[in-house]
Amino acid sequence: MAERANLVFHNKVIDGTAIKRLISRLIDRFGMAYTSHILDQVKTLGFQQATATSISLGIDDLLTIPSKGWLVQDAEQQSLILEKHHHYGNVHAVEKLRQSIEIWYATSEYLRQEMNPNFRVTDPFNPVHIMSFSGARGNASQVHQLVGMRGLMSDPQGQMIDLPIQSNLREGLSLTEYIISCYGARKGVVDTAVRTSDAGYLTRRLVEVVQHIVVRRTDCGTIRGISVSPKNRTMPERIFIQTLIGRVLADDIYMGPRCIAIRNQDIGIGLVNRFITFRTQSISIRTPFTCRSTSWICRLCYGRSPTHGDLVELGEAVGIIAGQSIGEPGTQLTLRTFHTGGVFTGGTAEHVRSPSNGKIKFNEDLVHPTRTRHGHPAFLCYIDLSVVIESEDIIHNVTIPPKSFLLVQNDQYVESEQVIAEIRAGTYTLNYKERVRKHIYSNSEGEMHWSTDVYHAPEFTYSNVHLLPKTSHLWILSGGSSRSSLVPFSLHKDQDQMNIHSLSVEQESISSLAVNNDQGRHKFFSSNFSDKKKCGIPDYSEFHRILDTGHCNLIYFASLHENSDLLAKRRRNRFIIPFQSIQEQEKELMPRSGISIEIPINGIFRRNSILAFFDDPRYRRKSSGILKYGTIGAHSIVKKEDVIEYRGVKKFKTKYQMKVDRFFFIPEEVHILPESSSIMVRNNSIIGVDTRITLNIRSQVGGLVRVERKKKSIELQIFSGDIHFPGKTDKISRHSGILIPPGRGKTNSKESKKLKNWIYVQRITPTKKKYFVLVRPVATYEIADGINLATLFPQDLFREKDNMQLRVVNYILYGNGKPVRGIFDTSIQLVRTCLVLNWDQDNKSSSVEEVRTFFVEVSTNSLIRDFLRIDLVKSQSHISYIRKRNDPSGSGLISDNGSDRINPFYYKERIQQSLSKNHGTIRTLLNRNKECQSLIILSSSNCFQMGPFNHVKYHNVIKQSIKKDPLIPIRNSLGPVGTAIQIANFYSIYHLITHNQISVTKYFQLDNLNQIFEVIKYYLMDETGRVYNPDPCSNIILNPFNLNWYFLYQNYHHNYCEETSTIISLGQFICENVCLAKNGPHLKSGQVLIVQVDSVVIRSAKPYLATPGATVHGHYGEILYEGDTLVTFIYEKSRSGDITQGLPKVEQVLEVRSIDSISLNLEKRVEGWNKRITRILGIPWGFLIGAELTIVQSRISLVNKIQKVYRSQGVQIHNRHIEIIVRQITSKVLVSEEGMSNVFLPGELIGLLRAERTGRALEEAICYRAILLGITRASLNTQSFISEASFQETARVLAKAALRGRIDWLKGLKENVVLGGMIPAGTGFKGLVHCSRQHTSILLETKKKNLYLFEGEMRDIFFHHRELFDSCISKNLHNTSERSFIGLNDS
């Protein structure tokens, strides 16, 4: 009784793990028999209490969490705001998906954490609570689904469905929720059936690998150890203790001068506590990895036997124990978890919160603005940033680590606990990322615009795939395509006034407009619209409107002045220079179109690239038709791969290079009608001219009708030509689809006269028996092998320096036999003449691979000229000159302060009159005299150059002006290339407001604005805008780009712009809900078409946001239909942590399969190590150390990975079991081919120790590298063929062994079992008999020590105050990567 009084009384909840510990202590102290008696009493007590409680479970026991309602409401509110942002174009689809998933994930997690406290407070004896938290049935996440919310589910592909299931199973699901939740339900049912067999097979393979490992010696004499440090923060204390208990020290441990533990001493709980309290230096322990033999293990490297708490006995079959103990919990592991699905784990970042209210300050030069992955604006800091928060009485300093996002602005007031920064999740956490492509489809049809320069993807110069350089909007301007031929095109927008006559406009009026076909963008110019009144368009010149059909962007200019010239239109990186004067234009209605110069984005031309092209008007067709090649050898320029890869992308245009002389064009009339339209003619019928085809379309030619149904439309073709019903004797009936040259044809015996032109013969079979032949007229085009350059350019152009050459090459734009389709009555260009740039390589001095081109703007004496300059570059050097600040030759508007305002981020240099100093040819693009206008090439490298600001003196000025006025657009181009235009009568009632309103009013006072403008006769136009003669009775011309010059009437200016900062400009894109006037209406999103004194006309458009690196499909100005792919985003998402979990994960690690294509593949890491170390250390040492290091590294990481999976499921396995198995996987090396040795064959797998020993014995380097074998491969690569054959592939293994004459020494357990011998383990182990005296003395010592260590432990039998054995593994454990072994300590 006296003894009992000394015992400490404990009163706490005890769970499974704690009971295990209790039992092991009891056995240590009292022995087996006594312990079993105690446990019987515990069992009886347990059943008795359970009977008395009588737990039953009903639906009423499922109590919903009260806070759920407002949590869900809050999340819905956030999603709604997000949806709005997406609609306004502030956030793109990927950001929206990410954010909504994180919103719901956080809500669901929060509910889950609320659940436990809620039960504890309201109903601690709730059966659901008791069951799940005692571990009897169900786990937290299942209970969460019953009483919280089911949360996010994943679809069968493992992708998230961003519609969360808000209800729980207690409330019941709606139909949609039920269907979504069925995706994941199947897995749970299948799991249980499959799980047992999987776990069994895993156990079998594990045992197979390690069955021969038996404890054969007491000490192998190794001096190695693996060091573990108690100071290491990455490892929780509990895991540290688990790692140490039961191990044997590899080295003495000193505390200052005093030795507190000696080598080969095994570690008990007392020693561990001492280590922790003393915070000793790193502790070196022996593990199965350090044991010096491969086929067995020694007692000291293994440590204590878990069964009876003593050093393991000799002859113990520890291999099989290890295999069993890893395989057995496999049945408890889930195969997959079905509750969270593929949540973006690792997606939520850590936050830094503000410690108190106050103003926040930081150095703005250390951060730069960016977007977070949710599309919010933020600052990114590269280095540690110290942030000061000043509250009234105290100043806080917060340091923000590098690569974090700062979510607040400088000098902003922050509340206490407000999130001020987001720390990027560290890269060390092994979140496997995968790259996902997401396509965004357009939901309306219309014309595509983008508000930034979109770069071409370099490989596909001729395709329509573009890469975005920076964040910008893509706009789909609404408007359908109406392809009728009677109504030429609808010139009317909603609410335009309209004359009744205008519908019956004759087609000539349109053909008389000069047409310029610039890649699907058709601009119609006419020199003077008022002349055309006779033609029946009476009303447009009176309207002062810009008429813009939604789809085709036909732009009309009303009453331009006679002397104004239409100048270089600029489109992304292409210029068109008109070549003839206006007088010519009036004589010849179809003018020659301009030469377009194409410059790549970076301005670098490779050899043989196309510099410019010219569309010859002789190869223009009005009608649709089919193109056939004659004697042309054509080869496609676009490589095959490009075409194949982008087959999904629409409208891929190939160019064919022409070798020879002629091709043919077979005209036909084509109408593309919507599906619903009723067609009044039958297929294969013959109609005359002007027949009604549908309600409002009449045919223009007579002939045969073919009707073809396409996906969303009907294509109706009318073939003109003669129809012949051939007799039986006619040979022509056999020819179908051939061209017949003139002079040969006998189409009919009656008409034997010779044909004048080529004809095309086509055989048509309306029914099976009848057929006839259609003879169609053909237009023949001859192609000169190269137009003489002199016809295109003046001769003085070619003063070639550095052997620059230009060749003229013709390209056919359509393939052989391809149908050529025109939209409306625009003409179609069949052949394009290109200038190909080349240069000589002969000079050794000019080993030039590429040339640089720039558009250069020169202003001389208030005249501004543009030049194209080509530089031969040898190196990538980039010289830029800083222009002089005070430049006397500044023209009026561009005063020396104003010049850098026009395009704030690029500066121009001025060349004064002293042009003669520069060598090289300079020719102006636009001479003022109308006769000669020429293209310029400067080919000297000592000219001048424009570059973006890097270190320019007035950098700060611009920075400040940006702060004052955020309206400045930052252009991403090679600098402003503008054109000069003469202005006749400039009225002074206009204000000319540039981008930067503030700076204008600062530099030119408004009162003297008027006279400035009267003086100037020329002024600069920005590259993106054009200002034409702005007198009030003419229209303001719409340009598809933002006009950077705003014309506002005086009163209009007051109404709108003083109150708000928004200035409406023509062509500007406006997002939805931008407030223009103080109490004006909220606008829909769109493009401003017309600005009048009191009104604005906006064409509706839908913005899509795209971030850098996204791929844009389609061309600028191209017509897109509903459902076409607009953009493809490539984004990284973390692999959801629980798609492969549990068993499959363990199996993946043990079989060494790569986890994902972009995983941190261990084998690759291993190879890298080997190569690097060999390079550093030379051959023999390199291989030895390289293989050693790799193996050590990969072993530690494998053990950690496997432990992580088991711990996350709450299963405790001792590290040493996993170590024994990992040791077998990593114990082989692969002989490599370098430095062939005579001993082993290349590609042979040998044991690491054997390789080392052989290397030492031969004194010759054996080249090998470490390799990870999976458990299956390791079982088939053992020393015993009998064991291999009994595992898998019996016939193959036995046949090979017979061929090689292998000998099996019957060392393992399995071979002996198969052959019925004595098993070499336990009592059958021979070594048990000879047990030397030295060993016995060691045994006795260790026994004594153990007794000493265990003595004082009964008093804290329910564990000391640290609650070491806290069974409930915290959630965090799942996420922290435990580095159980810190390094290799080779003492």
UniProtKB/Swiss-Prot annotation:
Cofactor: Zn(2+)
GO biological process, one term: DNA-templated transcription
UniProt-listed CDD domains: RNAP_beta'_C (cd02655)
Keyword Zinc belongs to the record: yes
Any one Pfam family match given in the protein's UniProt record, by short name: RNA_pol_Rpb1_5
Subcellular location: Plastid, Chloroplast
Protein name: DNA-directed RNA polymerase subunit beta''
The organism's taxonomic lineage, starting at the top: Eukaryota, Viridiplantae, Streptophyta, Embryophyta, Tracheophyta
